[in-house]
Each structure stands twice: as C-alpha cells, then as structure tokens.
Amino acid sequence: EGRFWNLSLLPAQWSPGAIDAPDPPVDVAAVNPWMLRMAGEVADGVHVHPLNTPTYLRETVLPNVAEGAASAGRSRSDLQLLVPCFTAVGDDGAEQERWRELARVQVAFYGSTPNYGFVFDQIGFEGTTARIRERQKAGDLAGMAAVISDDILEHFVVTATWDDLAERLAARYDGIADRVVAYFAGAAWTADPASLQRWQPVAADVRGRA
C-alpha cells in the first residue's frame, strides 16, 4: 500500500502471502537533475545512463543524488551508484579500435536524445546532439557516428590493454561508483565465450582496489 497505489486485487492462487525475506532493493534509472534528486530521496540505488563522463558524474550525478538523499535525512552512502562504462580493451591497437568504433556508434545513438545533449555541453562540445540529429533525420547512420570525434569519444570510453584495464577503471571511478558495469562485456562473451575468463580477474582486481 502506498500514497498513490494499493496493490491488493490479486487472486488467492497467485498471492505469495507473507515472504520471510528482507524487502528487495529498489533502484531507479536517472539522467537529469530532477530524477537524480528523486532517486537520491527514495531509491536504494541509482542506475546511471551509459552516456556518462567523469565530468557528468561529478557535476551532475553526485551533487543531485546527495541533495535528494539529504532531503530525506539520508546520505549519499545510503545508496548504491551503478555506473556503466564503455571499454575498448584488447591486446593490441586493432582490437581496441574495433571496440572504440562500436562505442562511437553507441555514443552517437544515445547522444541523439535531445534531453541528453547537456552531457556534451558540459565537456565543451556544444551543439553535438543537434549535429547528430541532423544526420539522423537524413538517415545517415554513418554520419551520426562521424559526429563523435576522437576528442569527444575519449570522455566516454576507457581504452586499455587487459593488463591495464583494472587500474584505469579504478582511477576513473574511485570515489564515484559503487559498482562499475562493463557495457560491452556481454557482447564480447556472446561473440567469444572464452572472453569471460579475461573479465573475471579484471573484476576481482577492481573490487580489490575498493
């Protein structure tokens, strides 16, 4: 039962009754300041959008989540902050470049959303979303990705060898994220199930640095 909804109309055969377990955590996905404040006020965790930069995390996410938490008598540490990250990881430059190009396409795709344009503005690339949308309206998918220059891409992607990846992730997200999600790990695993063995020590290393 809540302020707006009363979920009580449930046939007996489908009702689980009382559950002898703690309430599951409720996370909220948020991008803009209002949603981030709301998440900080009421949620157990915040799922950050994949279109994120260190600047966005520090200047938009952290202060707004903290403000929302404070309004409810809580602190930022009462919430889990889950941050996805585009990684371009490989043993050589060619492998890294393949993932960088996939990241470029994803940044352009997400960056075409008007409400997300401020993320580019924060890092000095004003008008990026408008340029992406021009190419989008023309049906030029390659042109959309081309708007994301290497200088822009650097703000969104961690490029590393497997040996360096954990250190770079820790340096980027230390003091910001409670959990880091490797955005492309699933795609890598689907293409090559053996790649999972390479992600496991990276995850263990990052956790060990927390």
Residues covered by each model-derived region:
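Active-site-adjacent structural elements that line small-molecule/cofactor binding pockets in enzymes
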Residues: 1-210
